[in-house]
């Protein structure tokens, strides 16, 4: 099957029909009308409205006039998960600049990044937990959970604050804790270096993340297909597979705590 082109999420919205039109591409038809009427904030709201199948729905973190497509995981551990990062085949490049990571890119029915501003707005309005699901090329799976997740919750301007990550309350699902190291860090891309290292971690790691000096997690790195010779520039989760193994599938998702 031919891969879908990767578009910034905001550009994709501009090309979509009106949000309540049944032909809106990629949105579950049975859920579309009700989600537009209720204007859900996240997948928790959609689940509460009775729509409990995995798929793409519309949420409204900006308010009633700006729908945002998102993938909802309605089955894992009771469902209600709003997926903000999804990778599974390398069809979308994640080596991108600040603007793309701020606004989002890809398609919610494929590989995508929801956008830092969307994440900030969600965590500004509700308390969330984070789950990170991982799979390797031998079909082994593991996850990590954090009972507290937020993005620049106290900032006047989240962007000026660097969309700082806060996580706490690690719970191990076999993956180990590779994210607590990044808590308190600003987000960095190759064109906006906000890490603590003397060099540009995003450029060195071929990705974008809440780098410190540099990382134990690099889930937006190159899709390298398993073991690789280059150091720490694949889809790495160091506490599970180290710095020389690029994962097959990742999902980062949040649910109300």
UniProtKB/Swiss-Prot annotation:
Q: Could you confirm whether the keyword Secreted appears in this record? A: yes
The record places domain Fibrinogen C-terminal at 34-257
Give the domain of life. Answer: Eukaryota
Disulfide bridge map: none
Q: Return the InterPro entries for the record.
A: Fibrinogen-like_C, Fibrinogen_a/b/g_C_1, Fibrinogen_a/b/g_C_dom, Fibrinogen_C-term_domain
Where is this chain primarily localised? secreted
Protein location: Secreted, Extracellular space, Extracellular matrix
**GO cellular component, as recorded:** collagen-containing extracellular matrix; elastic fiber; extracellular region; microfibril
Q: Carbohydrate attachment sites?
A: 89, 139
Which Pfam families does this entry report, sorted A to Z?
A: Fibrinogen_C
Q: Where is this motif: Cell attachment site?
A: 28-30
Signal sequence annotation: 1-22
Q: Which GO terms describe its biological process?
A: cell adhesion; cellular response to UV-B; elastic fiber assembly; regulation of collagen metabolic process; UV protection
Q: What PANTHER family does its record include?
A: FIBRINOGEN/TENASCIN/ANGIOPOEITIN (PTHR19143), MICROFIBRIL-ASSOCIATED GLYCOPROTEIN 4 (PTHR19143:SF225)
| The protein's assembly and partners | Homodimer. Can also form higher oligomers. Interacts with FBN1, FBN2 and LOX. Interacts with COL1A1 in a Ca (2+)-dependent manner. Interacts with ELN in a Ca (2+)-dependent manner; this interaction promotes ELN self-assembly.
- What function does this protein fulfil? Could be involved in calcium-dependent cell adhesion or intercellular interactions. May contribute to the elastic fiber assembly and/or maintenance.
The name this protein carries in UniProt is Microfibril-associated glycoprotein 4
Species per Swiss-Prot/TrEMBL record: Mus musculus (Mouse)
Q: Which gene encodes it?
A: Mfap4
């Amino acid at each position: 099957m031919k891969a879908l082109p990767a578009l910034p999420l905001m550009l994709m919205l501009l090309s979509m029909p009106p949000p309540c039109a049944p032909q809106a591409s990629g949105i579950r038809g049975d859920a579309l009308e009700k989600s537009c009427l209720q204007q859900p904030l996240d997948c928790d709201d959609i689940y509460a409205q009775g729509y409990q199948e995995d798929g793409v729905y519309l949420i409204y973190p900006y308010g009633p006039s700006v729908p945002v497509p998102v993938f909802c995981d309605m089955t894992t551990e009771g469902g209600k998960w709003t997926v903000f990062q999804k990778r599974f085949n390398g069809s979308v490049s994640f080596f991108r600049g600040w603007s793309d990571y701020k606004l989002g890119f890809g398609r919610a029915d494929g590989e995508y990044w929801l956008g830092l501003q969307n994440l900030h707005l969600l965590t500004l309005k509700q308390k969330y937990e984070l789950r990170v699901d991982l799979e390797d090329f031998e079909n082994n799976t593991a996850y990590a959970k954090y009972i507290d997740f937020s993005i620049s919750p106290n900032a006047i301007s989240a962007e000026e604050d660097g969309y700082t990550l806060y996580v706490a309350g690690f719970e191990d699902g076999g993956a180990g804790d590779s994210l607590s190291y990044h808590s308190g860090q600003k987000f960095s891309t190759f064109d906006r270096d906000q890490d603590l290292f003397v060099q540009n971690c995003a450029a060195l790691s071929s990705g974008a993340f809440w780098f410190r000096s540099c990382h134990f997690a690099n889930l937006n790195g190159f899709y390298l297909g398993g073991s690789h010779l280059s150091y720490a520039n694949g889809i790495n989760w160091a506490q599970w597979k180290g710095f020389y193994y690029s994962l097959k599938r990742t999902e980062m998702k949040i649910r109300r705590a």
